[in-house]
């Protein structure tokens, strides 16, 4: 009887233990399945020393909150209207981090290890092969028609060109929408091939294709070289009333002035007339000086008309070859899009961001550091000061000398410099904005895995940010050089005129040899 009671008690205890164990097991399975159903992204840590550890829930939650806050800040500050963006990517998508599960089997199932090379991809691939849940998954790329690839915007050629003159006798032009468009697909190409570790051969191929694109583009640009060189010659006339750097001042004369005055003024007397007008700047209303001033004013006006005509002619030439330029842009687009469409992941739910990281390290990081090492705002301040001081000096000289061809020349150069400054200011704002945005987005994009669809959006987004940043950085540097090339020549003219006034007010007879001595003993600003 006692033995039967003991047996009955043990049976009851066993049944209770079985029920409790079953409930615990079902609860664990339910928890795991809930995590599986909601999982979109798992973070991968960025330090080699911590690769055997996994961050706990609090750390990840804190990181999520910081990431979301950074995204809000970026969205609020990105006001650039430089080139219309065709990417409708919402950077908040795909950033739903979950706590890492506590079950080792769950972690092993998805091979979430802190590796950033092909070893990680191999682990993912092997796990997927051994996983019944993923045997029927289609690993082909998603439908690329859903992505809004960048197109050439509707633009007016005349309003979309920066004309650059980085040094005297040289002139170049940049069609800004083309530059940004080509750069966008260049970075899309590199981001795509860098997604895999073994990219050396592909990288060489991309470099070669981009070099070919650039050469073809320059070849089309060269079709306007004759018009461009003609414009350079006219600019030289405008900026050099006569060549003050030439020891033989008689060697530079206005042939155009003979046409204006119906050859009434002999060429051999022109230098003497300029000297006389310098001596008599306070007597501009005398009959002889009035005639000379009228001649100079008409000469300058005709040169300005010539300048505007030739500039329009250059723009027309560029527009005439617009189809050739557009074809080159489409070739670059097709090439970059093709590489992008070949991008694949071993596991579509866990695509790593090696490509974004490697491309950033290789091409962008050095540029970011270079920009941050410069004080772009100080550059703007210095240029503003130059423009203000030169305008003040111009006003004073104008009062002293009245109508004088050098004054018109200074006004022309000064107007050009103000336009160049406005362009530099414009590009500087874009550079500052994009530097901050790129750095913030890189923090969110690297050392992580994404679902494939989200990774592709991010590659498009980063390529867009890079192209805007690099276009403005390149153009700002060329415009900067152009500004100081003009400023150097402006200084030369100012020095000459100040010297003239000093001689005049000291009652020293003005002869050309004095100016030669001045140039020899006091080198003009370099």
Curated annotation (Swiss-Prot):
Disulfide bonds join 224-317, 345-351. One of its GO terms (cellular component) is host cell plasma membrane. The keyword Disulfide bond applies. It comes from the Eukaryota. Potential candidate for the development of parasite blood stage vaccines. In vitro and in vivo, induces neutralizing antibodies capable of inhibiting merozoite invasion of host erythrocytes. The record marks 140-141 as: Cleavage. Residues 1-24 form the signal peptide. Residues 259-294 are annotated as: Disordered. Its main location: secreted. It holds the Pfam family Rh5. Transmembrane segments: none annotated. Cleaved into a 45kDa form during merozoite invasion of host erythrocyte. GO terms for biological process: symbiont entry into host; symbiont entry into host cell. Residues 33-51 are annotated as: Mediates interaction with human BSG. Keywords: Cytoplasmic vesicle, Disulfide bond, Glycoprotein, Host cell membrane, Host membrane, Membrane, Secreted, Signal. The keyword Disulfide bond applies. GO terms for molecular function: heparin binding; host cell surface receptor binding. Residues 259-279 have a biased composition (Acidic residues). InterPro entries: Rh5_CC. It is found in: Secreted; Cytoplasmic vesicle, Secretory vesicle, Rhoptry lumen; Host cell membrane. Forms a complex composed of RH5, P113 and human BSG/basigin; the complex bridges the merozoite and host erythrocyte membranes. Within the complex, interacts (via C-terminus) with human BSG/basigin isoform 2 (via the extracellular domain); the interaction is independent of BSG glycosylation status. Weakly interacts with P.troglodytes BSG but not with G.gorilla BSG. Also, interacts (via N-terminus) with P113; the interaction tethers RH5 to the merozoite membrane. Essential for the invasion of host erythrocytes by blood stage merozoites. By binding P113 at the surface of the merozoite and human BSG/basigin on the erythrocyte membrane, leads to the establishment of a tight junction between the merozoite and host erythrocyte membranes. In addition, the interaction with BSG results in BSG dimerization which triggers an increase in intracellular Ca(2+) in the erythrocyte. This essential step leads to a rearrangement of the erythrocyte cytoskeleton required for the merozoite invasion. This is Reticulocyte-binding protein homolog 5. It comes from Plasmodium falciparum (isolate 3D7). The lineage of its organism: Eukaryota, Sar, Alveolata, Apicomplexa, Aconoidasida.
């Amino acid at each position: 009887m006692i033995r039967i009671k003991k047996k009955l008690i043990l049976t009851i205890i066993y049944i209770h233990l079985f029920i409790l164990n079953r409930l615990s097991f079902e609860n664990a399975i339910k928890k795991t399945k809930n995590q599986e159903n909601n999982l979109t992204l798992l973070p991968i840590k960025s330090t080699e020393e911590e690769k055997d550890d996994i961050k706990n829930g609090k750390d990840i939650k804190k990181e999520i909150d910081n990431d979301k806050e950074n995204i809000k800040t970026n969205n609020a500050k990105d006001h650039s209207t430089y080139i219309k963006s065709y990417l409708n990517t919402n950077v908040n998508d795909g950033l739903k981090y979950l706590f890492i599960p506590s079950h080792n089997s769950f972690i092993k199932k998805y091979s979430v290890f802190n590796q950033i090379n092909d070893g990680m991809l191999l682990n993912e691939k092997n796990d997927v092969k051994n996983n019944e849940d993923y045997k029927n998954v289609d690993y082909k790329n998603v439908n690329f028609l859903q992505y809004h690839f960048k197109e050439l915007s509707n633009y007016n050629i005349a309003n979309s060109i920066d004309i650059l003159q980085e040094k005297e006798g040289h002139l170049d032009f940049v069609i800004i929408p083309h530059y940004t468009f080509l750069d966008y697909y260049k970075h899309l190409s590199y981001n795509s091939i860098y997604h895999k570790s073994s990219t050396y051969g592909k990288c060489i191929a991309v470099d070669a294709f981009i070099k070919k694109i650039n050469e073809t583009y320059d070849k089309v640009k060269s079709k306007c070289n004759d018009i461009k060189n003609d414009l350079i010659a006219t600019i030289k006339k405008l900026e050099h009333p006569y060549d003050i750097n030439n020891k033989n001042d008689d060697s530079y004369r206005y042939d155009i002035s003979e046409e204006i005055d119906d050859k009434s003024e002999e060429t051999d007397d022109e230098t003497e007339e300029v000297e006389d007008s310098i001596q008599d700047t306070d007597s501009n209303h005398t009959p002889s000086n009035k005639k000379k001033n009228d001649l100079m004013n008409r000469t300058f006006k005709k040169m300005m008309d010539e300048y505007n005509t030739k500039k329009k002619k250059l723009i027309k030439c560029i527009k005439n070859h617009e189809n050739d330029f557009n074809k080159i842009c489409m070739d670059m687009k097709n090439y970059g899009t093709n590489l992008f469409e070949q991008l694949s992941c071993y596991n579509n739910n866990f695509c790593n961001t090696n490509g974004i990281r490697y491309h950033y390290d290789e091409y962008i990081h050095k540029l970011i550091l270079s920009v941050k090492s410069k004080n772009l705002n100080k550059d703007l301040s210095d240029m503003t000061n130059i423009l203000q001081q030169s305008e003040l000096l111009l006003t004073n000289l104008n009062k002293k000398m009245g109508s004088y061809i050098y004054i018109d020349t200074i006004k022309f150069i000064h107007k050009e410099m103000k336009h160049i400054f406005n362009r530099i200011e414009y590009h500087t704002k874009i550079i500052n904005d994009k530097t901050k945005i790129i750095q913030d987005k890189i923090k969110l994009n690297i050392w992580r895995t994404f679902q494939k669809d989200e990774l592709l959006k991010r590659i498009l987004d980063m390529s867009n940010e890079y192209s805007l940043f690099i276009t403005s950085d390149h153009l700002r540097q060329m415009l900067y050089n152009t500004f100081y090339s003009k400023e150097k020549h402006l200084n030369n003219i100012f020095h000459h005129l100040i010297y003239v006034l000093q001689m005049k007010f000291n009652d020293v007879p003005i002869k050309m040899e004095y100016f030669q001595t001045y140039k020899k003993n006091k080198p003009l600003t370099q």
